[in-house]
C-alpha cells in the first residue's frame, strides 16, 4: 500500500501559542484515517495546515510524492487534496448548483466535471432535489452534504473532512458516516477529524489520538476503540 500523505514533525503556532508541537502521521492510498482528540488538541489546525490555509513553523508535508508545506491553498487543491471545512462554510446566497461549480473552479475537464456532478448528486439525492435552492435556506444536514459534495467536485485523491457530523441529529450522523464509506469505495482516500470518536473509529482503518498538539497514541482503529485509555477519554467508558 503506497503512502499518499506523510506529515513529519509538523509545528504550527497561533501567535505565541504552539498549537501543533511536532506531529507526524501517514495516510496510505485507499485508507480512511481518523484523527481524534478533545477540543483544542490541534486537530483542525493540523488539517488547515495540510490544506494550505495555515503555514507551519517547521516540518514536512509530502502529498503524492511532492512537498506541499507552506504552499498556497489553490495549488494544493490543484494537486488533488481537497477539504470540507468545519462548520460547513458553504456560500449561502448561491444555489446548490453554483456551490458545486465553485468546487470545480480549478478544473477545465468539462466531461469529467459533469460526470463527477452526477456522481455527487447520486451520492446525495437531497442535493438533486434542492439543485437550484440557495444553500443558506437548507437544513444543517443538507448544508453538510453540500460542503462535502463541493469538496468532491475538486476531484480529490485525498479528502480532508473536518467535523462532518457537528451539530447534526443522530439519524443524519449515521447517514454522513455511511456516505464516508461510499466515498472511499469510489477510490478516494480520507483523513477525518471528528468529535464523535466512536463513529470515527467505526469507519476508519487507522487512527491517531492527538492531545495538546502531540500524537499520544496510534494504531488500528478497531484496536484503539477497545483501548481502556481511549475508551475513558473519548468514548464515554
Q: What is the role of each PLM region?
A:
Residues 2-237:
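Glycine-rich phosphate-binding loops of nucleotide-dependent enzymes
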Amino acid at each position: 500500500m503506497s503512502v499518499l500523505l506523510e506529515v513529519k514533525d509538523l509545528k504550527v503556532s497561533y501567535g505565541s501559542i504552539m498549537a501543533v508541537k511536532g506531529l507526524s502521521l501517514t495516510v496510505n492510498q485507499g485508507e480512511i484515517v481518523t484523527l481524534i482528540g478533545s477540543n483544542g488538541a490541534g486537530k483542525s489546525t493540523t488539517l488547515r495546515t495540510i490544506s494550505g490555509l495555515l503555514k507551519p513553523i517547521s516540518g514536512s508535508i509530502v502529498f503524492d510524492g511532492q512537498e506541499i508545506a507552506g504552499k498556497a491553498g489553490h495549488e494544493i487543491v490543484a494537486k488533488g487534496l481537497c477539504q470540507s471545512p468545519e462548520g460547513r462554510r458553504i456560500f449561502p446566497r448561491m444555489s446548490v448548483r453554483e456551490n458545486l461549480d465553485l468546487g470545480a473552479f480549478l478544473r477545465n475537464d468539462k466531461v469529467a466535471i459533469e460526470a463527477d456532478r452526477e456522481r455527487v448528486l447520486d451520492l446525495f439525492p437531497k442535493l438533486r432535489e434542492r439543485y437550484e435552492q440557495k444553500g443558506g435556506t437548507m437544513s444543517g444536514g443538507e448544508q453538510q452534504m453540500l460542503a462535502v459534495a463541493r469538496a468532491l467536485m475538486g476531484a480529490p485523491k485525498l479528502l480532508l473532512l473536518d467535523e462532518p457530523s457537528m451539530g447534526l441529529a443522530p439519524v443524519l450522523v449515521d447517514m454522513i458516516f455511511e456516505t464516508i464509506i461510499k466515498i472511499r469505495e469510489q477510490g478516494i482516500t480520507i483523513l477525518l477529524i471528528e468529535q464523535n470518536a466512536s463513529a470515527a473509529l467505526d469507519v476508519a482503518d487507522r487512527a491517531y489520538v492527538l492531545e495538546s498538539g502531540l500524537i499520544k497514541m496510534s494504531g488500528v482503529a478497531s484496536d484503539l476503540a477497545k483501548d481502556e485509555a481511549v475508551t475513558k477519554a473519548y468514548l464515554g467508558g
